[in-house]
């Protein structure tokens, strides 16, 4: 069996295994609840707009901000799901001896790790795209608002999920399954908070505080990709009504799209951390 076929086979098995775990039921339940609550909330926005309590511009602005808020909820659900799937998938099999029995066959450790990574990426990205598209349809049906760049925004959310699960996979080669998930989600939350702090610093003209967000987005690109996704979901008029660049102080608006250089850095980050995961797994005593 060629290496490429081995990787694809392991990816398919990983995807099948992930679909049978209880965490999938939790993800589906949380997603359904969030979509239902958001549908009710957006219907209220539509009702207020119909009663002339809100102008059409205010309704679009409100829908834009609420959509970013709900999408952050989806990204958090995806972060929790993928982080706690990545740990048991690798370190759990290592502790139980399953990995040793698989690697006893002519299968390289790098192929095993890459296959599991590919399967988890397909799972996490698929969840984000399906849930995000469903949410966009809910918003369109209730308040007649469609994001300006939904495909690019959903792709960036899938990229955010890929970054986080790559980190979780690296951690799972060194620590226990639970610890790897906790650390990955903790870093995800810390980076988001640092991004909010940096945005506030930028709106106040404080370069030192603004640098906190800039550095955090370079160390872990999840918040940078999230802000790029927000820019694709939000209505362009939202920036004008919130004062242009000063909108960075608001956690659910993004002042500018991502640069090609940052996207290249995010790809390079995944490659580097993935390489570290392969190196760590190859040296791990099974």
Residue ranges and their predicted role:
Residues 79-86, 99, 134, 167, ...:
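Hydrophobic/aromatic residues in alpha-helical transmembrane segments
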Residues 1-28:
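Aromatic- and glycine-rich beta-strand/loop motifs that create alpha-glucan
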Residues 75-94, 267-283:
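Transmembrane alpha-helical segments in integral membrane proteins
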Residues 41-61, 65, 184, 188-276:
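Terminal transmembrane helical anchor/hairpin motif
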Residues 35-87, 113-181, 213-216:
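Secretory targeting signals
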Residues 11, 85-121:
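Helix-loop-helix units of permease transmembrane domains in multi-pass membrane transporters
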Residues 21, 43, 276-286:
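Membrane-interface capping segments at transmembrane-helix boundaries
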Residues 17, 91, 102-104, 172, ...:
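Helix-capping/transition residues at the boundaries of transmembrane alpha-helices
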């Amino acid at each position: 069996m060629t290496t490429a076929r081995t990787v694809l086979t392991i990816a398919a098995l990983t995807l099948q295994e992930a679909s049978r775990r209880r965490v999938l039921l939790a993800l589906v339940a949380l997603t359904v609840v969030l979509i239902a609550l958001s549908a009710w909330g957006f219907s209220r926005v539509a009702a207020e707009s119909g009663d002339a309590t809100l102008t059409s511009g205010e309704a679009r602005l409100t829908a834009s901000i609420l959509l970013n808020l709900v999408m952050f909820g989806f990204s958090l659900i995806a972060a929790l799901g993928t982080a706690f799937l990545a740990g048991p998938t690798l370190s759990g099999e290592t502790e139980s001896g399953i990995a040793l029995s698989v690697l006893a066959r002519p299968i390289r450790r790098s192929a095993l790790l890459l296959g599991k990574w590919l399967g988890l990426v397909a799972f996490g990205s698929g969840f984000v795209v399906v849930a995000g598209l469903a949410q966009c349809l809910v918003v369109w049906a209730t308040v007649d608002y469609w994001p300006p760049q939904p495909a690019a925004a959903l792709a960036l959310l899938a990229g955010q999920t890929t970054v986080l699960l790559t980190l979780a996979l690296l951690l799972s080669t060194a620590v226990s399954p639970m610890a790897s998930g906790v650390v990955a989600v903790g870093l995800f939350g810390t980076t988001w908070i640092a991004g909010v702090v940096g945005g506030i610093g930028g709106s106040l003209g404080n370069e030192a505080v603004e640098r906190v967000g800039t550095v955090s987005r370079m160390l872990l690109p999840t918040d940078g990709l999230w802000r790029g996704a927000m820019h694709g979901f939000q209505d362009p008029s939202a920036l004008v009504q919130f004062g242009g660049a000063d909108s960075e102080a608001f956690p659910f608006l993004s002042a500018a799209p991502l640069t090609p250089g940052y996207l290249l850095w995010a790809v390079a980050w995944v490659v580097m951390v993935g390489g570290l995961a392969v190196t760590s797994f190859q040296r791990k005593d099974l």
